[in-house]
Amino acid sequence: MEEGSYRQSRLCRLLGNPVAFAMVRLLAENKELSPSEIARAVGRSVQRVSTVLGALRLGEVVRYESDGKRNLYRLKHPSEVKGVLSALSRFVKAASAVRR
């Protein structure tokens, strides 16, 4: 498998995790958030959120900066991620319309 296809499939796998997907959507709506803010918003433990953030970091979906006291996470490529989320939304709507 070529590198580009592999990376695309890896991104699909990451976003296939409902917690990761919710976190990415949340970060798309906010400039930057701490793990505790993300955990509160998605209803998961900080430990679980931190684990998922690590996977999203490895997948180059998110990045973080430290302000001394805490890490703040943001999307690495916000406009591209928002485009993917928008395309997924349109696909789901189209697929739902076909079933009817």
Set out the residue ranges of the language-model regions.
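Short, hydrophobic-biased segments on the C-terminal half of alpha helices
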Residues: 24, 53-54
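Intrinsic structural disorder/low-complexity segments
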Residues: 50-51, 93
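N-terminal helix-turn-helix DNA-binding core of bacterial DNA-binding proteins
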Residues: 6-48, 69-80
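Beta-hairpin "wing" of winged helix-turn-helix
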Residues: 57-68, 74
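Amphipathic alpha-helical dimerization/coiled-coil segments
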Residues: 1-8, 29, 76-100
